[in-house]
């Protein structure tokens, strides 16, 4: 009973955030109507991509040295992508207001696995990136002595080939991802309560995204209810909580529910591997592995 987790923290004047996510894996956003949600008596604000653009908070870096939209604006690119963020006086009202946001989508062809994503005729997902012509997130990485490996296979008396699929796995921590962002407009100090596995890296990201000096950001990590790697990345919900606190001037708490965690948290693995191993005289002499990693 001595543990102190994010959900144990209550700050004066704290409000609550909830995230609207896309039901589609790939679709254009035709329109977003937040008027009914804003009319809810307990709703303080509804944040969309346009609002974040005004604040200079529309984009964020990712753990794979890429960038992504904090909230989808013109298009959604994966199922569960964040579309709008509601801030209300209590958690129930925030979640109720999500149902009042009307988003019109124009569904597009989707890519459902990494191998098909590399097909020449696969739909281009990151068409927002200048010069992007395929669905490779990073350059092809190679290691080893190709010439020696080719020679080993040419001289081998036995070659074994296998196709191996290492499925995607979910870390499923007991405590889901969440944050309390508390921005003080008088001092410019941002206090963050957040159980994460990389607080110094998070501070750097928040400074970059929000335009604050790192020494003006203080991250207070309480006990972490499990992480297993999925509490290393920065999630859009964190940035939205910070944006909400900057706009409202009060603490904003966002915690994903279990369904959100299962859908949208950081997954691992999902490898498609083609492997060849060769031997000569009973001794392994060469190995080739082609890996597609999602």
Task: Give the label of every model feature segment.
Residues 52-56, 225, 261-262:
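Short gly/pro/ser/thr-enriched loop/turn and capping motifs at secondary-structure boundaries
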